[in-house]
From Swiss-Prot:
Protein name (record): Ribosomal RNA small subunit methyltransferase H
Principal location: cytoplasm
CDD domains, alphabetized: AdoMet_MTases
Organism, as annotated: Mesorhizobium japonicum (strain LMG 29417 / CECT 9101 / MAFF 303099)
GO terms, molecular function: rRNA (cytosine-N4-)-methyltransferase activity
A biological process term (GO) from this entry: rRNA base methylation
Catalytic activity from the UniProt record: cytidine(1402) in 16S rRNA + S-adenosyl-L-methionine = N(4)-methylcytidine(1402) in 16S rRNA + S-adenosyl-L-homocysteine + H(+)
Key words, A-Z: Cytoplasm, Methyltransferase, rRNA processing, S-adenosyl-L-methionine, Transferase
Tree of life domain: Bacteria
Amino acids binding S-adenosyl-L-methionine: 46-48, 63, 90, 106, 113
GO cellular component, as recorded: cytoplasm
Length: 338
């Protein structure tokens, strides 16, 4: 994410100029002040954290990627005690600070992860079919080589919105019987050969499948939902929640959460009436998108959308996944999924 038109914020651990998407809008919505405690739940290359530190606020920065944490250690030392790095899923953000004045989340894979071939997030380079942000647990290769075709089709269809999900799943089943998939280019080439690619196609035929695998392997939608519940518990009254998403599935989760938590008239049938009718957030504007100049500087910003909300004094509600309308996926079990 290298966009922006002012401050020169460098990527942690590198010399590339790095300004995160919607930086100005994030700071405006978050409104960090001196002595505030802000949780950056998706530290990544440290762009938001650096900008927040520059306001005089302190930051608890969380990332489940050990490489991101290691790259940020110098910044932690330079911060004079105002930055604390935590290697953990951002869904646990309320476990690492007693209370916070703000929470910011930048959802999705970081440019640093995409640029490392050995992480297997992209087919721009050949690398192992991995995609694990935490570098532990089920890999993309495990999913591709062992899941039933019906389960693969469901993952590709829902998480990647891939219209050829069934065809691709059946192709994978036939190919892996001869030889398991191991590399990113191997899978990408197999999909392109099977589906084809017209000259007018702007994206590679494997793009949506790779997106689906990454989201599934890291349970990104579930982590986001749990992080929103955690932010509700962590934020002080008047504290601000700011979330930047890059995909309609992610944005839908954030939008539904804010709408549910700001709604004093109705609530989930699974919760006590008194709880359901207490607003724990109030909306702070609608979805904010990048301007033409930012999109021109960084095409990735085109899909970015920022949503924000302000915490009320009401006690946090119980986490209820039914408000998100997430479908049941193989190996993932959450209350309220259909």
């Amino acid at each position: 994410m290298t966009v922006g038109d002012g401050d020169d914020i460098h990527a942690v651990g590198g010399s590339v100029r790095h300004i995160p998407v919607l930086l100005g809008e994030v700071l405006e919505a978050l409104a960090p002040a001196e002595r505030d405690i802000i949780i950056d739940g998706t530290f990544g290359a440290g762009g938001y954290t650096r900008a927040i530190l520059a306001t005089g606020a302190s930051v608890v920065a969380i990332d489940r990627d050990p490489d991101a944490i290691a790259a940020g250690r110098d910044l932690e030392v330079q911060s004079g005690g105002r930055l604390r790095l935590v290697q953990a899923p951002f869904s646990t953000l309320d476990e690492h600070v007693e209370s916070a004045d703000g929470v910011v989340l930048d959802i999705g894979v970081s440019s640093m992860q995409l640029d490392q071939a050995e992480r297997g997030f992209s087919f721009r380079f050949d690398g192992p079919l991995d995609m694990r942000m935490a570098q532990a647990g089920l890999s993309a290769a495990d999913v591709v080589n062992s899941f039933k075709p019906g389960d693969l089709a469901r993952i590709f269809g829902f998480l990647g919105e891939e219209r050829h999900a069934g065809r691709i799943a059946r192709m994978i089943e036939a190919r892996r019987e001869k030889k398991p998939f191991e590399g990113t280019l191997e899978l990408a080439d197999a999909i392109e050969t099977h589906i084809g690619r017209a000259p007018k196609d702007k994206i590679h035929p494997a793009t949506r499948v790779f997106q689906a695998l990454r989201i599934y392997v890291n349970d990104e939608l579930g982590e986001l939902a749990k992080a929103l519940f955690a932010a509700e518990r962590a934020l002080k009254p008047g504290g601000r929640l700011v979330v930047v998403t890059f995909h309609s599935l992610e944005d839908r989760i954030v939008k539904r959460f804010i709408a549910d938590r700001a709604d004093v008239a109705t609530g989930s049938r699974h919760l006590p009436e008194a709880q359901a009718r207490t607003a724990t957030f109030r909306k702070a504007g609608g979805g904010v998108t990048a301007g033409d100049a930012e999109v021109a500087a960084n095409p990735r910003a085109r899909s970015a959308r920022l949503r924000a909300a302000i915490r009320t004094e009401a006690p946090a509600r119980a986490g209820d996944f039914s408000i998100f309308g997430l479908p049941k996926l193989p190996g993932i079990d959450r209350p309220g999924e259909r």
